[in-house]
Amino acid sequence: MFWKFDLNTTSHVDKLLDKEHVTLQELMDEDDILQECKAQNQKLLDFLCRQQCMEELVNLITQDPPQDMEEKVRFKYPNTACELLTCDVPQISDRLGEDESLLNLLYDFLDQEPPLNPLLASFFSKTIGNLIARKTEQVIMFLKKKEKFISQLLKHIGTSALMDLLLRLVSCVEPVGLRQEVLHWLNEEKIIQRLVALIHPHQDEDRQSNASQALCDIIRLGRDQGSQLQETVEPDPLLITLESQDCVEQLLKNMFDGDQTESCLVSGMQVLLALLEPRRVGTEGLVDSFSQGLERSHSVSSSILRGIEPWLKNFHQLLLNPPKKKAILTTIGVLEEPLGNARLHGARLMAALLHTNTPGINQELCRLNTMDLLLDLFFKYTWNNFLHLQVELCIAAILSHAAREEQAEASGSDGKVEPLQGSGDGNGKLETTPSITSPPENTMVTHLFQKCCLVQRILEAWEANDHTQAAGGMRRGNMGHLTRIANAVVQNLEQGPVQAHISEVIRGLPADCRGRWESFVEETLMETNRRNTVDLAFSEYQIQQMTANFVDQFGFNDEEFADQDDNINAPFDRIAEINFNIEADEDSPSAALFEACCSDRIQPFDDDEEEDIWEDDETRCAARVMARARFGAPHVSDNYSKNALEHGGQDRKTGSAVARNVPGLAAPSSPTQKEGPRSESDSAGTTWTAVFDEPVNPLSATPGAARDVGSSAWAAGPSVVEEKGWAKFTDFQPFCCSETGPRCSSPVDMDHSNAEGGQSPGPEKTFGPTSPCAWNVCVTRKAPLVASDSSSSGGSDSEDDEKAAGAVEAVCTGHTGKVSPPPRTAEAAVGRAECPDSTVLAPACPAPSEVTISPAVATIAPSKAGSPTATIVVSSSVAAAVPPGPIVAVTTAAPAIVATLGTMTKDRKADALPEGAALNGPV
């Protein structure tokens, strides 16, 4: 919006450019000149690219400003001129890089005598470096023409900006071919030898330091770019020169020639440390001194090791007699003989040499007893942690490289040939020569534990520190590194590759020393490690703003919350009990399951009326079961889920219901079975079977219609009903036990009225005198007779009650119920159990019943005892597994069924049908 409505103020640069005699300084006084230049204001660029303006800009960055100017504005114009020349505008870069007169004017800055102005030198280096990146070929060709360029550059090497310019020539030239050309040109100019010559005691410290830093950067840049540029086959010539033995020897000669100065020694050792650094295999990860990639570095730096080995005695002497230093005041007092930077770098060099694992160097260090000297310095300078770290690295290198050597021997032997000794040849290769003596690493380990007395020194230093602390003194500053050294020894003693060797050394100690070491490891060191492993996070000092008992008082007490039992959302607390998993057989494919679900839930439009009737009933039952399960009731068993998916669609087409298994119920019968169950006494008499093949009358069929009994239920023996896992509904009034609940939809009992003229409830009926339901929430009451007349009155009801003495009705909400033996007379009343899902039939014995679902079959068979009472079973979904005996199961069937089965007398006695008669009427 700012630019859209032209709210920006017009730059004053354009107004100045419209003037006839505008000067460069007037434009540079404007604050927005750099923004206008980067925005490529054409009028401004045309003005700046004039020859006079370009010469003036170059003079500003190469000549010292007048001394009489105010200091705060003295370098204002040189700084602005440098920014204008290096603002990455192609027009300015081309104008400066292609004009040789401007380049000569810029190059004249190197003709000055040192020291150069550091700020102007930075302007010059930045401008030349930008030209090298933008106009590489032109600038390189121009510099090559200058024979004294390298000499003049090294003359001002004491200025850090000129050292940066040298590194730009080495690393910032593109493409690769041109870069190799520049490297060869610099190598021909002997830039490496000249830099090494600058590391000399007679040179200035700044020149020595910058020369050393330049050599270190050349080493690192050469190795990094060599690993990144995989297409480069030709090695870096500068790196090859640096790694040559002659160059290393010349450097060491300059370091120890004549009077030794700390700056010269430190600068030279920095270059040696850079040469001994492990070579990086790439940008994926760094290869440390313990990795497998170190051998490649050793093979490259073998000339370095050969050049260093003759000078090890000089480094040992340096550790003994360093350059003299004055006493310094520290926080713990005056240090009369400081360790010094030279000895610290000497210790770093010893650690780096030990990491190379060169046998010749190891043997020379053992001969010189350098490790013993380093341990002396370790315990002498107790507050120099830099030294402590290097000594720890030396010990770790000795132990770790012994491990690597033994691993190499194990991998090289095939079990048949005698192990070979690995001896280095200086280039990282192993010479497999038979030997009886121990490898060099073991020699170094022996020297460390026997000659240097590492164990005794650890114990003595620890005991001395304990005495000091007991007397009220401070804990020594090297105790942390001493603990790590002791842990490294213990680790290699227990499971390290030099375990046997160290164990032998420990056993060779005097008895008192060995006992002290064992006690130290088992008690003192273990306790120290335990204290060191304590997590310091979330300590008391980090929560000082909190009170001590904040955690105890945080939150609310239980009594502050209201009881949630009466909450309407309390049932949803058990939402986690809902099982959303539909387990299917592993053999059933997903497509078959999907089709089964579709056929189970969706009915075709050409279904018969009776199928819709049974479907409505099952849907209501299933909905009620799911409602219970949602509020914590037990879930339907796994078999129900599988059978419902597999047989749901087919069972409805054949007039049967989906098999449902609940705890304690028998397995469902075959959906194609048409005959009713037979008892064991069927062979003794004729069985009368009722077949229900006629269409169902929609007016007489109700959702509470009874289910038939399958043969599989008869085949299964009675089983004990398990009631565990069922929900308890004692907290509220169950709907099944309500006297004023909804009337049963059964046509058999719907027209029966009570004494007051109202309709009596008509639940489904089952024999059983006073058997409570499985959940023990039912009430015992008198039940009406099996069937009733629509014209019955209250008086007839009372008469029926008298005839039905002893009969009870068990109204429950479960699937199964425990019942008692039925009455012995045909006039016995009917006990019935009303369930939301199915009809429960009472067996004729005290054994618990077992109910399941099966196709609609009604069978009448003579009882075993020959009683005139026939066994009548009418159901379509529930089967009762009962033992042989008289059974009368009266369901909520239509009056037509009762008329077909037998004649209803005035006193409501049912006459049995003749044997062999078949019932084909509607159910």
UniProtKB/Swiss-Prot annotation:
Q: Which InterPro entries match?
A: ARM-type_fold, SAPS
| Location(s) in or outside the cell | Cytoplasm
Q: Keywords in alphabetical order, please.
A: Cytoplasm, Phosphoprotein
Q: Which residues carry this modification: Phosphoserine?
A: S289, S746, S796
Q: Where is this region: Disordered?
A: 409-441, 662-685, 743-766
Q: Is Ribosomal protein tagged as a keyword?
A: no
Looking at the UniProt entry, the stretches that span the membrane are none
Tissue expression as described in the entry: Strongest expression in bladder and lower levels found in heart and pancreas. Very weak expression observed in all other tissues tested.
Assembly, per entry: Protein phosphatase 6 (PP6) holoenzyme is proposed to be a heterotrimeric complex formed by the catalytic subunit, a SAPS domain-containing subunit (PP6R) and an ankyrin repeat-domain containing regulatory subunit (ARS). Interacts with PPP6C and NFKBIE. Interacts with ANKRD28.
* Main subcellular location: cytoplasm
* Chain's role: Regulatory subunit of protein phosphatase 6 (PP6). May function as a scaffolding PP6 subunit. Involved in the PP6-mediated dephosphorylation of NFKBIE opposing its degradation in response to TNF-alpha.
Q: What is this protein called?
A: Serine/threonine-protein phosphatase 6 regulatory subunit 2
Q: Which GO terms describe its cellular component?
A: cytoplasm
> In what ranges is there compositional bias, type Polar residues?
430-441
What cystine linkages occur within this chain?
none
**GO MF term (any one):** protein phosphatase binding
Q: What does the sequence similarity comment in the record state about its family?
A: Belongs to the SAPS family.
